[in-house]
Design a protein with these regions (language model features):
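Metal-ion/cofactor- or nucleotide/acyl-coenzyme-handling active-site neighborhoods
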Residues: 1-220
Length: 220
């Protein structure tokens, strides 16, 4: 099949529903610290997987990818064909009946329109924006795998590495966008936490233990 690099302009863009009102959304990003987590704790909860994290949590309700290069790999397209949840992107190069496209906005801050997601240097901002639309005021967002660094052994991801390499300074670039969403979350009255052991982004969001966080949700 010829996957032509042709921009697709959907009209209208997909509107994210307010589907998890005042609930907790867990976002599984790609950082190596995910290997230290018991992901079974998330089964049955509100979960968004970012690109290849879908292989670790195939039962997640949402899959978000922002990079066409990820979609361009046949194994990933096949995974989406098998996936039972909903797939969302901001890439206008994608045209597929199982992929919903939102409008991409630039930083600073999260996009407030429910058909838009903010992304520039990292899919984590867009996935957080997706979660914010889903949970709304009074909701909570918890990051996993938001490490902001490589592991001590040089590992870059908890899953099979992407075929493209991380550029020097990429985490600093990502941080410049991530810091701008913190005021947005406060404005939206959404609590956000980072459950990524050893994260380099410890000053961005309060650090929490995943097991304790899930325990609190069960007790609520």
């Amino acid at each position: 099949m010829n996957w032509t690099m042709k921009r697709y302009d959907p009209a209208p863009f997909w509107n994210v529903p307010h589907e998890w009102p005042a609930q907790t959304a867990f976002i599984v990003a790609g950082g190596p610290s995910v290997l230290q987590q018991d992901l079974e704790l998330l089964r049955g909860r509100n979960v968004i997987a970012i690109n290849s994290s879908i292989y670790a949590v195939p039962w997640a309700q949402f899959l978000y990818f922002g990079d066409y290069r990820w979609w361009d790999e046949e194994a990933n397209r096949n995974a989406i064909e098998r996936y039972q949840g909903r797939t969302v992107t901001t890439s206008r190069l994608v045209r597929h009946p199982k992929v919903m496209i939102c409008q991409k906005t630039n930083p600073p801050g999260l996009a407030l329109q429910c058909d838009s997601l903010m992304q520039r240097y990292t899919s984590l901002t867009a996935a957080t924006n997706l979660a914010a639309h889903l949970v709304g005021p009074g909701g909570t967002i918890v990051w996993l795998g938001a490490d902001g660094k490589h592991a001590a052994d040089g590992r870059t991801h908890h899953h099979v590495p992407h075929r493209w390499y991380s550029k020097p300074g990429c985490y600093d670039q990502q941080l410049t966008d991530l810091v701008t969403i913190v005021p947005s979350l406060k404005q939206l009255r959404i609590s956000a936490f980072n459950a990524s052991p050893g994260t380099a982004w410890h000053e961005l969001l309060p650090a929490v233990d995943l097991e304790e966080m899930v325990g609190k949700q069960r007790a609520a």
